[in-house]
Amino acid sequence: MKQSLFLKKCSKFCYVLFAVCGCLACTQNQKIEWPQVTNETKPWTRWWWEGNAVRTTDLDTVMRKYQEANLGGLEITPIYGIHGYEDRFKDFLSPEWVDLFLYTLQEAKQLALGIDLANASGWPFGGPWVTPEDACKTVAYKTYQLKEGEQLSEPVRYKEEGFVRLAGHTPVKLADLKEPVSANADLQTLALDQVRYKKELPLIIVTANSDKGECLDLTSKIKPDGTLDWTAPQGDWTICALFQGHHGKMVERAGPGGEGDVIDHFSASAIDHYLSKFDEAFKGKDISYLRYYFNDSYEVDDARGESNWTPAFFDEFQKYRGYDLRQHLPALLGMDTPDKNARVLYDYRQTINDLLINHYSIRWQHWAAKQGKGIRNQAHGSPANILDLYAVSDVPEIEGRDLVSIKAAPSVAHTEGKKLSSSESATWLDEHFQSNLGDVKKALDLFFLGGVNHIFYHGTCFSPQEAPWPGWLFYAAVHFHPNNPFWEDFKYLNQYVTRVQSFLQDGTPDNDVLLYYNIADVMSEQGNRSLQHFSGLDRNMLESSVRESAVTLTENGYAWDMISDKQLLKTNIEKEMIVTPGAAYKTVLVSAAQYIPYETMEKLMALADEGATVVFYKGIPQDMAGMILSEEKQAHFKEMLDALDFHAEGAVKCARVGKGKICLSDDINALM
């Protein structure tokens, strides 16, 4: 049998792995054997159902080919259809679609192939059953300046001019679209990416803030024609008016029956209403063989503007932050002092963070858990701490080619004690049919180095047997399907992946350093957008000291995992080790942070007091993040810092704290 160069390299890798295992066996005086092969130790693939145009006769054939290629499972993702096959299209979650899904589950069970299902036809969550009330929102604003005795000379109104963005090539004019978007026929052909209708936006609130610190709610003084019936009293006044808009983001690459508005991810009722469609479709059906539901990244704001509002935001803000944001709108809009602007903006973004976790991720996971299932979630791109979003997921999933960013999902799997962390793998490596299996293996090895142990190829299109070569394709794929010339050798790559994943899944994480994922500095930064979106250590974290530390640790051979504020609060000390629910670490590293949450600093001091070594790179944070209204917390924060008595130990300065110590240096290697 002919083998390509990459397969020879696979064999060499396995030889080295066996050699290492042999050494371990000699050292520990016990025999190490290959763990049992299951469908989870094998690689899986994203399985696009283009147009949902699948047929039972073809399903039997292609699924057997997938099994023979040593794939362990399939993630069904309904997607846009192929031109010329419209007569085969089936609406997502329709009775006909459900019958095909049930048939697929039955066939997969016979072939021992696992099955996951995307919780949307495309991404993000959304569809034609999402009402305008449940669709993603945006906030617009206008500001005015008045002096004593003055009145506004213009009405308080905001007119959305409207626009339409397209994913396809069919010409569409905004004036030709009905409202709501679900009222339009043939959305599959229209391929809408974002729609905002031309209209006047409803007013949320109008406030007036004086230079003396007064704040007035003037909303009730707005007449039906928009006139503000108010004369400014003594002082200089800043008038802020907020308006609620429709963000307009559509489900990307949606298949038939899945086109429509994206949900409001910050609304509990929106996700509940959305998921009820699945409950209705599967009612009375046996979907017990389905393993996990899946979400293909956030990407709500891959659009014009941002989804940065929900109708209950002011009340939610007060619940989470403890003060009334309505009294601080100038700071939210960047019109107060730089310090106050940063603190209020941090609190606004942190509230968005909390709503995304509690109103979307947790409710979604609980919905799946009630069915005896779990969720796989790609959290990257979210306006929230992705480590906390990953922590809610049963299987956190990452993608990309940047090693230190890849470690975000596996880090959470390690610290939280999750068995699996997955990856969307080999996405768009090259142009169509230009990537070979050697390129794929290189991409997979990077994920393994980052700690991923559950590979999902990107991906495999269902293709009917009679479709002319090369069959049905997806635009951003390497094409892991039987029509690809490398298919004959694909099973050998999958054997390699299975062996690597068998040990990775069977092992226990043993990293030494917890790298504090400080996002408070970024969340406090003014910018041209109201939200910050996180994807590990790239994008807005490219210039951060956290990334600098991650790269330095990696280049110098230190094993590390990232940890969030919330996750750090759950740690404790055992035998001078910092213990998380899933692993134990020798130290926690905080990198050049300006701001830090009060609770995090308090926890770091407590860990040191109980025997831990906590190290700070390039200084200790001197300020707390957000609007801290408690004088007690402010005083205690200062006391914690003032109590540190540092003494030089070479390139490192250390201060004893109880049974442990706090160390700082400008040299990471010295701190290690």
Locations of regions flagged by a protein language model:
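Short linear sequence motifs
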Residues: 6-11, 19, 40, 134, ...
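Carbohydrate-binding surfaces of carbohydrate-active enzymes
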Residues: 44, 55, 60, 73, ...
